[in-house]
Regions:
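A short beta-loop-alpha structural element at the N-terminal edge
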Residues: 2-14
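Active-site rim helix/loop that mediates acceptor-substrate recognition in acyltransferases
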Residues: 15, 22-70
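Short hydrophobic/aromatic beta-strand or adjacent loop that forms the aromatic wall/cage
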Residues: 48, 149-154
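Internal, conserved structured core segments that host functional sites
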Residues: 49, 53, 84-87, 114, ...
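Conserved acetyl-CoA binding element of GNAT-fold acetyltransferases
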Residues: 75-90
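Conserved acetyl-CoA pyrophosphate-binding loop and the N-cap/start of the following alpha-helix
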Residues: 83, 92, 96-104, 114
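Conserved active-site alpha-helix within GNAT-family acetyltransferase domains
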Residues: 111-114, 121-148
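Acidic/histidine-enriched, glycine/proline-rich intrinsically disordered or flexible terminal extensions
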Residues: 160-204
């Protein structure tokens, strides 16, 4: 197993594995492969945290990071880190590869001087990496009332001795926005797959 930075020659393979990992999971089809494709061209993209896992010459997992702005209570902005998508080929899921990639890159982010990582995800899963509800630190997701619980929005503080944010509002970077028509066109580059409605999807 080799954890290394993604290279330009890997782009299509990584986009395809991301598509395989997310297809019909949260909605019929998926858009995460286009997110990655678009993200690489954006200023918010953190190239030095774009890692893959290679196994026997095959890329089986990928993680990408981006920088986002947190609007502080005092009106200023603070740069924070976010990650995702985290993609693992279906046949390699639940074998610890995603966990290895997340831990490796979080340590690398700390070495690079980043201190706060914000994500949305399953709190029961991400708490093992040190993530806590962001509302505990008076940080809230844009559009969600501050007095309502949103446990899926979490923060990991990599070095609490350096933490000095008194509260703020987070919004996703525009580089994560997806245009439906562009997604349909982009999907034509990949092998045909059937979009299915499944129980448990977030969008039906």
């Amino acid at each position: 197993m080799n954890i290394r930075l993604e290279e330009e020659k890997d782009y299509f393979e990584v986009e395809n594995l991301t598509r395989e990992a997310f297809w019909n999971v949260y909605r019929p089809g998926c858009f995460e492969h286009l997110v990655i494709h678009n993200l690489r061209k954006e200023k918010c993209f953190v190239k030095d945290l774009d890692f893959v896992i290679e196994l026997d010459g095959k890329i089986i997992a990928n993680i990408v990071y981006a920088k986002a702005n947190l609007r502080l209570k005092n009106g200023k902005e603070r740069e924070v880190l976010i990650f995702g998508p985290v993609s693992v080929l279906p046949e390699y899921q639940k074998k610890g590869y995603g966990e290895k990639l997340i831990k490796f890159t979080m340590n690398r982010a700390k070495e690079m001087g980043f201190n706060e990582i914000l994500i949305t995800g399953n709190p029961n899963y991400y708490k093992k990496y040190g993530f806590e509800s962001a509302s505990k630190y008076n940080i809230f997701y844009e559009g969600v009332p501050e007095d309502s619980e949103f446990p899926c929005f979490m923060i990991c503080i990599l070095n609490k001795e350096k933490y000095d944010i008194l509260g703020g509002i987070y919004s996703d970077p525009k580089c994560y926005d997806i245009d439906g028509a562009k997604l349909e066109e982009f999907d034509k580059k990949f092998p045909y797959k059937i979009k299915e409605k499944r129980a448990g999807q977030l969008q039906l």
